[in-house]
Every structure is written in C-alpha cells, then in structure tokens.
Amino acid sequence: MLRIKLTYLLLCCLLVSNQLIQAQRVLHVDVLVVGGGASGITAGIQAARLNVKTLVVEETTWLGGMLSAAGVSATDGNHLLPSGLWGEFRERIYAHYGGPSKVATGWVSNTHFEPHVANQIWKEMASAEKSLQIIHQYQFRSAIVQKGSHISGARFINLQNESQLVVYAKQVIDATELGDVMASAGVPFDVGMEASATTGENVQVPATNDIIQDLTYVAILKDYGRGVDCTIVKPAGYDPTEFDGSCLDFYQDTTRIKPGVDCAKMITYAKLPGNKYMLNWPGHGNDIYLNLINLTPAERAKELVKAKQQTLRYIYFLQHQLGYKNLGLADDEFPTSDRLALIPYNREGRRLKGVIRFKVQDISKPFDQEFPLYRTGIAVGDYPIDHHHRKNPAAPQHLGFYPIPSFSIPLGALLPVSHSGLVVAEKGISVSNVVNGTTRLQPCVLLIGQAAGVLAALAAQNKKNDARQISVREVQSILLQQKAYLMPYADVNLSTPGFYSIQRIGACGFLRGKGQPNAWANRTWFEPDSTMTVYQFLSQLPALMPVNNQISKWLESAKSEGLLSVGRAVEFIEGIKKSTRKNTNVTSSNAQVSSSWTTWGLSNYNPERAITKRELAILLDKIVDPFSAFSVNHLGNYTSP
C-alpha cells in the first residue's frame, strides 16, 4: 500500500511539474522586440537581416501596428524620402495595386492602401527572414531587470490560455504603443507637455502638464453600392450636434472653427483602393481624448469602449444625417466582431528621457545649435508638427503647425541615459512633446524601428550590454547599406549619382542642405547641381574640422574669390586631408583626380570650370573620407582624430 501511495505521489509531482513547464515557456534570443507594430516589425526584420537571432512578440494577430492593425492606412509624409524599409514597403504596396497612381486615391496622402494588405505585406517580409521568429497573441507583462539597471528580457502572458512566456535577450527593443517596457523597467520618461521654459521651444506652454494628444479608433467603411442601406443601429448617446463643424454641409454653431471642406470632400479625405474609406477625421469627427498610459490592460480595454462608441456615433452621423447609407463597416478588413480596428491609433505615450532630447530648435535650425545632432541622424521625416487636442478643452489649442523643414532623428533619442540592454522605438523616443507631433507619423516610425534593429543587433553581435557603446558611424554605415537615408534631402534619392557620398558628407556637416517649410511636406534641398563660392565652401569647414589652423587663413583670402573650381577644390581637399589626417601621404593631385574622375561616376573633368556640390561631395568622400575618419558622439561632437 505504501509503495502504491509513493508511486501515486511521484506521478502527481511529475504531472504538476510538467504542467508548470508547459505553462511557462522560456526562450533565449539575441534581440527581443516587444511589439510588432510599425517600429517593431521593421526592427525585427532589420535585426534579422544582420544575422542575429531575433524574436518579435506581438499582442494581436497582425503585424504593422498603426499602418494595419490600427487602420491608419494613408501614410503621412516622406513621399520624397523613400528611405530604407519604408521605401521597400511602399514598393510592395505599389506592386500589389499596380503602381503609384493606383494608391493616390485620397487627398490626405500620396499612398493609400487597405489595412489587411499592409498586414499581409509585413507578414511576407517577416517570413523571408530566417533569423526572425514572430509570436502572436502574447501580452507584455513585465521587464526582467538585473542589478537594478540592466534589462535582460521580458515576461508575457498568452491571451488565449494564460500560459506564460519568458524571454531572455542580449538586447530588448521597446516597440510598444505607449512605452510600457521602459516604464516596467524603471527607465525615466516624460508624459505630456513640457513648459516652454523647460525646452526653450516657443510654443507658449506656461507649465508642464500630463496632457497627451487625442487618440482615434479608426473604422474602414466600404461602399456596398447604390440602394444598399448599411445604417447601423443608433448608438447610445447619439446627438448630431456633436459633429457640428465636421464639414461645411453641417455647420450650425459658428463659435466652432469653420470647416474647410464640404462633406463630399471630407469623405474622400482618405479614400482607399477597393471603394473603401478610412475614418480618421480630427475636426469634430472621431478623435477622442483618453489617457491610457498608466492603466492596466483591462482598464485600457474598458476605456477604449468610449473611443469605439465615438467612432460608431460618427458613422451613424455620416449615414443618417449626411445620407451616406451605402457606406458600411467593411466586412473584409479587420478580424474583429465589431469590424473596427484591432487597436486604437495612439498618437502619443511615454517619451524616453534619453541621451539627448530632440527639440524643435534642432529641426528648425540644425546648424545653429550647441550640439549638432544632425550628424547623428538615423531616420528622416518631413511632416509638419501636427497636434490633435480639440477633444480636450484643458489642452492648449494654439500650437498649430510650427513651421519646420525636414529633419533627421538623432541616434541618442533611442537610448536611455543610464539603463543598459534597452533600445526604445515607436513613439517612445526621446523627443519633446511638440516634436512628437511629427516623429509619430508612420514612415518616420518605420525608420525609427529599422535604426533600433541595427543598433540592437550590433550591440548583441559585439557582446555589448550597453548599446550606447556602439559607434554612431557604425549604425549609420549599416543603415546606408540598407538603403536608408541619414539626411532628408528631397532632391537626392537612391538613383541620384553620388547618393551615398552626398549622404555621408551631409552627415559630416561639410556641405549643407537648405531647409524649407512647405505645407504638408517639408523639404531640405541639397541642390546637387548647384555651385558655390570659395568662401561659402570654406565657411562650412569648421563644422567638420576640430583642428585646422589653416582655415582662418583660407577664409581671409577667399573673400575675394569667386566660384569654387574643380582644380581649386582639389587643392583645398589636399590641404584638408593633410591638416586633419596625421601620418597620411597626400597624393591627390589634379592629374591623379583626373584619372579617377570617371571611376567615381563623374564626367567632364576640367580643372578650370566651377565644381558642383555633387562633385564636391564625391571628392570629399573619396579623398578625405571624413565620415569614416572623424568619429562623433551622441551629441554630434567630433571625438577624433
């Protein structure tokens, strides 16, 4: 009898032990990406392309975040900046629909697509990477922190059976919508608006507050044909005056801002291929103010019911009040019971207190700042600063669109000050509240994720617990290899001769672009075929060269000189190399440059004629190679030679 009892007890112990093992799955990877949204999926793909074992853990069944699961499938900005994985994704969108003209269906964007197509494309791109694993329907629960400040992994729970997943990683990327990983790990962050006195930004915020931007629960409507009535059941609390001022056809309360479009124009704002319409309308439409940041997952879900009801009331308004009865919730988009998006469109969450804080001044006047952060650029954007605050009367309503040119996001914005093992992406990077209004847009967030993937992969490969130890130039070099932009030049693309030289020299501050605020698509022009005077060229050299006694002498004599010629450029470049590169033989005579001219992709060698900026960039890159020779830190300051 005793033997039977002991055997039974042993079997019970084995059964319980087996259940515990099954209930808690443990994985070890090089790079863990928490969240498969816009930044998360590009971070995962890019890290895997660098041959490191990468895992993306995503809460939903979709990939792509705001581009797909949130339904914001009309991209904002970067039409002339098809950088890196954003450009690759867009090419796949073009291929799916039949070219750029087929996705220019609305007027808010140049690129519109169905959310489920975006999800399909991201899954196809992810499946092509052998070093990448995706796990769906696991919700982030907590970060694993060692010795108080090193993030070494994360814990998740399965949303279907509540089993646990524990992942240990050499590097963790926070690609969550609201910055949940850094909060769990105790990494310092900000929430809401900073006082103007704190940031030095001229936006007239008198005191720091915790106000974030409105969010939106997006719906995709489908045209079911004339005569078909798709009107939904009247939502509780419906009052058409809630949407007064959403369009000119329904504008009664003249104390509200006068709408700029009629209702027909409003509907086509984000018309998608397939006779579908995205609903993401800020002007008395379906925006809502909810601050979900400090809530539990269950509390967030409860609050989001309000956002869904806001959108349903707006849909009923369109159908019942404006007569668009033929437009109903698409039955072939989201795998949800209510046919709404899988997740909300979160415009803002926690913002990292990073190695640097990227502010409006760094964008509006990048060459005039104490720290030349543009030299550390890893992602580009060109959208204006766009804040949604109408649904929160406590929020300042005066911000508007601060005029800025296009910009480069600095690498230090992805890095915590003192915690190691963590890289921050998505909308959680270290930018001011104001700047978040432009860095939050889809193409920009995709590129932030790609840079995060490079940084984390390099840290894992080089066995660096702290990604801050990875060279800025090393990250930038790999991004260039991956066809990503460092500098936001609207007139220099991948097909432009000298693209890579221009990008490298621009990131050194040697030859500068001209910024131009421009409505919904800001610009920076490099003007590759333009010429410059000797003085204009030499006056930019101090931006590059920490040690050069010759510059002041050159500048004094240059005031009387005209346009910089090819021959004179070679002379200066020889002098630059000699004075900044110790123990280097200078052999770049005009004759030798002439023999290499065509090899470098140039034509019409004539020492007497004026040199173009493109040619000058190529000469500087090939002869001096300042991008490789001069290291920069996260502040953009040169640390060598």
Question: What is each model feature region?
Answer:
Residues 1-9:
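Bacterial N-terminal signal peptides that target proteins for export
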Residues 507-641:
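Terminal recognition/anchoring or ligand-binding modules at protein termini
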Residues 25-37:
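Beta1/beta-strand and adjacent pyrophosphate-binding region of the FAD-binding site
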Residues 8-17:
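Bacterial N-terminal signal peptides
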Residues 46, 52-53, 58-144, 149, ...:
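Conserved N-terminal/central alpha/beta ligand/cofactor-binding core
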Residues 19-23:
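Sec/Tat signal peptide C-region and signal peptidase I cleavage site
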Residues 148-149, 153, 160-171, 175-478, ...:
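Flavin (FAD/FMN)-binding glycine-rich loop and adjacent Rossmann-like elements that form
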Residues 40:
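N-terminal Rossmann-fold NAD(P) dinucleotide-binding loop
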